């Protein structure tokens, strides 16, 4: 049977001014939040609660199982990591991952960050002492609660579904990209690919003082989407073009990429494909786009990157 995409109509709420209207949950309401279009709440999105990490603290996560899932077939697993002050279900409605899953038959997991709707990653909160080295920071943050939750969810999904362990992917938006990037740098050996929108990492977390890279996991296929008008956090002490440049250089170094990419322009998506001896890197500059992710980005991630 030909794979299909299901486009559900929704009821627009054009008066909405909330970042994540709670009324969306379980309804057909759709909104446009700062240029980010939502989809109707997916009918098959499962909400789960439980203690799955050894510290005894409860977590919440959402699982999407498309009707096209075939239990006898090895199936990819996609982690969708929400932005700051968002939720797992919020990431599901502000992206098109569930629609891609309908077409392709893979499983989606959308976890909630454990605390305050913010992932436990360096660069989110400045709680490390100033004199602490990048090495000690990296070691301390290597196995946070959120990281342990991801590992626990992988094991849970492997028990419940016929998951292809060689096709586990992670994608994040903004703070979720911080989480995705940190996980890729520390535990990327279990990922087939990592992708993110906005949210480039601060350079002190990528490079030692001598310029060598900070990396525990080795190479991993990476996709970086950078909106042209992304902007910087309040009181940021760094340059946007510089941080984007060196976030790209970081993975070019780790993946041993060729310096000259193949270029393709699709509408407002300016795409650079870097071939790597160890893993590829895709860099996308999105013209006229501010901080956020386009609704079709999940399709780009899958069609150009994760599907291979």
Where do the model's predicted regions map?
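Alpha/beta-hydrolase
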Residues: 79-81, 197, 286
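Primarily recognizes the serine-hydrolase "nucleophile elbow" in alpha/beta-hydrolase
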Residues: 158-160, 165-218
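Extracytoplasmic/secreted cell-surface and envelope-processing proteins
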Residues: 87-90, 117-121, 203-206, 231-235, ...
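Histidine-bearing beta->alpha loop at or near hydrolase active sites
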Residues: 267-270, 287-292
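A domain-start/cap signature at the N-terminus of enzymes
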Residues: 1-77, 103, 142, 146, ...
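The feature captures the conserved acid-bearing segment of alpha/beta-hydrolase catalytic domains
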Residues: 192-278
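Catalytic active-site module of serine/aspartate enzymes centered on a nucleophile-bearing elbow/loop
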Residues: 296-308
């Amino acid at each position: 049977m030909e794979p299909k995409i299901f486009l559900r109509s929704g009821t627009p709420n054009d008066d909405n001014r909330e970042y994540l209207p709670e009324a969306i949950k379980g309804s057909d309401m759709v909104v446009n939040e700062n240029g980010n279009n939502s989809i109707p709440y997916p009918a098959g999105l499962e909400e789960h609660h439980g203690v799955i990490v050894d510290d005894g603290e409860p977590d919440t996560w959402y699982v999407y199982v498309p009707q096209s899932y075939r239990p006898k077939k090895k199936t990819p697993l996609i982690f969708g990591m929400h932005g700051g002050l968002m939720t797992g279900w919020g990431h599901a409605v502000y992206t098109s991952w569930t629609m891609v899953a309908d077409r392709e038959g893979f499983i989606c997991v959308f976890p909630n960050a454990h605390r305050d709707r913010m992932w436990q990653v360096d660069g989110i909160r400045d709680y490390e002492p100033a004199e602490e080295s990048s090495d000690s920071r990296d070691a301390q943050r290597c196995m946070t609660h959120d990281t342990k939750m991801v590992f626990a969810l992988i094991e849970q999904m492997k028990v419940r579904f016929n998951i292809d362990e060689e096709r586990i992917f992670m994608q994040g938006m903004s703070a979720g990209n911080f989480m995705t990037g940190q996980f890729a740098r520390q535990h990327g050996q279990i990922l087939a690919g990592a992708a993110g929108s906005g949210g480039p990492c601060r350079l002190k977390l990528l490079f030692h003082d001598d310029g060598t890279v900070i990396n525990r996991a080795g190479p991993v296929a990476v996709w970086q989407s950078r909106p042209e008008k992304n902007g910087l956090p309040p009181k940021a002490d760094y340059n946007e073009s510089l941080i984007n440049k060196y976030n790209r250089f970081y993975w070019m170094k780790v993946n041993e990429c060729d310096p000259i990419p193949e270029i393709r322009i699709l509408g407002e998506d300016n795409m650079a494909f870097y071939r790597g001896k160890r893993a590829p890197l895709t860099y996308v500059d999105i013209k006229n786009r501010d901080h956020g992710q386009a609704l079709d980005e999940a399709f780009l991630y899958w069609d150009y990157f994760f599907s291979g």
